[in-house]
Amino acid sequence: MADFFTEKPVATNVAEFSVSEIANALKRVVEDKFGYVRIRGEISGYRGAHASGHAYFALKDDKARLEAVIWLSVMKKLSFPPEEGMEVIAVGKLTTYPGSSKYQIVIEALEPTGVGALMTLLENRKKKLAEEGLFDAANKKPLPYMPKIIGVVTSPTGAVIRDIIHRIFDRFPLHILVWPVRVQGETCGREVASAVEGFNALFLGGGIPKPDLIIVARGGGSLEDLWGFNDEAVVRAVYASAIPVISAVGHETDWTLIDYAADWRAPTPTGAAERAVPVKLDIEVHLASINSRFRVGLARYFDFHQQKLRALVRGLPTVDQLFALPRRGFDEISSRLQRALCVSYDKKCFYFHALSLRFSPRLLNTKKAQYAIQEYTGRLHRAFLRNVEKQRAQVEMACRLLKSTSYQNILERGFVLALGKDHKPIKRLMQLPETGQISLRFFDGEIDVSTHDRAVNRSLKNKRIKSQKDDQGLLF
């Protein structure tokens, strides 16, 4: 027994690994060999997202089962919620989990497959959005009759955009803005929603003009091809658009959720172009017809009223008829007035003749004398007034002369008048009393002053007078 435990191991060339080494080696082999793969399968064991936001489930078919995980960042980007039993195509990277010796796929994109699964998902989404009122007819906006600018959301390289441009230019040429998007694939829904929101974000007067109408168009295809136009983000963007939207996705039998949210659904992209703009020639013909009818109607209107006016004119009396009665009355009144004046004149003449017979020649002479006296009286009164005015003028002239020679004017120029006790002017120095009172009259008043030492003052004054005698005379 002891020999058994002490026996040396048999020599071999097989490499020896630890559990973790072999697990990591398998992990590298799987990841390097396969990398990214697309796997079709049925979702199994899905119970919704974990508390962390990640989702753990399995993909299976009738023979095998593969564990799968979707991280939170990818879950937020999915265009539909995964459901138990849904057939999908998962795109991701194969890897292993060394802790439990399991291999799994880390899903980075997930899309439904199979018509049944897609139809179920479509119906559920349609019901949900309809309950929110996104498809209500009351929310539909009227389309402009003649838009100036049309925004088109579609692929820039497909036949759809060429058909739309060709049809619009045939009917009514105008400005077209194309917002290029992918019309199929995983990013289709997000790009279409961003395009609709982008057109609404433009403002009037900017570098890029804001369209008056938006057309979202795509050619026909399968349910999977058109799935991007069933995206919830597309429906909400179209519903929130302030610009009217025409949906033209697929053929007439193809219905997507954008058709329910749009303001008008066209069976084809060509039909959308025809609905967007009227035919210019039809408008011109219609305007010409309206113009012609207007001219005819206007001519009829004038003819009718001209005939009516002529009838009214014929019913009106002429000028002679209008003035015949007043003229006749005027003539009668003129004749009566002339006769009345003649009669009155004759009466006055007869009356004055009768009065003249009543006056004697003496009375007539007295009347003539009275008239003469009245005339002479008037002439005398007028002569008296003229004489009074003449005398008044002479008095006023004398007053002005007297005022000009008044000594008050001299006092006003700065001179002083000396008055003695008798209030007579003192003209010479010798007239001053030796002692006593004299009055000095100024322009604005009078003051009494006393005199003394007349001899001294007189001699001084005499010298001054002699020196100035030749230059200035006496004041008075």
Curated annotation (Swiss-Prot):
Belongs to the XseA family. Its EC number is 3.1.11.6. It catalyses: Exonucleolytic cleavage in either 5'- to 3'- or 3'- to 5'-direction to yield nucleoside 5'-phosphates. This is Exodeoxyribonuclease 7 large subunit. The gene is xseA. Keywords: Cytoplasm, Exonuclease, Hydrolase, Nuclease. GO terms for biological process: DNA catabolic process. It is found in: Cytoplasm. HAMAP family: Exonuc_7_L. Heterooligomer composed of large and small subunits. It comes from Bartonella bacilliformis (strain ATCC 35685 / KC583 / Herrer 020/F12,63). GO terms for molecular function: exodeoxyribonuclease VII activity; nucleic acid binding. It comes from the Bacteria. It holds the Pfam family Exonuc_VII_L. One of its GO terms (cellular component) is exodeoxyribonuclease VII complex. Bidirectionally degrades single-stranded DNA into large acid-insoluble oligonucleotides, which are then degraded further into small acid-soluble oligonucleotides.
